[in-house]
């Protein structure tokens, strides 16, 4: 039987992002904590130096999001907002999925490109993660 990979999610994603920069991102989750996503998850994919002061960090993240060629979006179950979640403060597309069933995926789709251009072009790749982690402190 194949070994199931074990790793700290943020560290594994940082390894995958090495030498690349984010072009666009789509996150699918059942449970969602907007403040945790903005403060702890999103910085992993932007790879910029950030202040430890929350208000300054938010400004830095907003500037980084504005510089992306495309948007970042989070799709979550309409009933999946964590009750103790902090409010969203960044310009991230947040889309509550409403239907009769439960929206329960936990996937990440990242369009990335090489940081360094080769002959004026940057190769792009789609990074896909299928996992069991919600975008919450306890899930991540």
Give the predicted meaning of each segment.
Residues 1-140:
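PLD/PLD-like phosphodiesterase catalytic module centered on the HKD motif
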């Amino acid at each position: 039987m194949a070994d199931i990979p074990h790793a700290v999610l943020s560290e594994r994603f940082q390894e995958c992002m090495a030498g690349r920069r984010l072009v666009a991102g789509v996150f699918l989750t059942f449970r969602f904590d907007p403040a945790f996503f903005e403060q702890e998850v999103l910085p992993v994919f932007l790879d910029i130096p950030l202040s430890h002061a929350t208000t300054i960090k938010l400004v830095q993240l907003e500037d980084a999001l504005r510089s992306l060629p495309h948007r970042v979006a989070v799709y979550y179950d309409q009933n999946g907002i964590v009750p103790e979640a902090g409010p969203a403060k960044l310009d991230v597309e947040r889309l509550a999925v409403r239907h009769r069933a439960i929206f329960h995926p936990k996937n990440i789709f990242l369009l990335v490109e090489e940081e360094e251009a080769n002959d004026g072009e940057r190769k792009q790749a789609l990074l896909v993660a299928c996992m069991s982690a919600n975008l919450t402190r306890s899930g991540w």
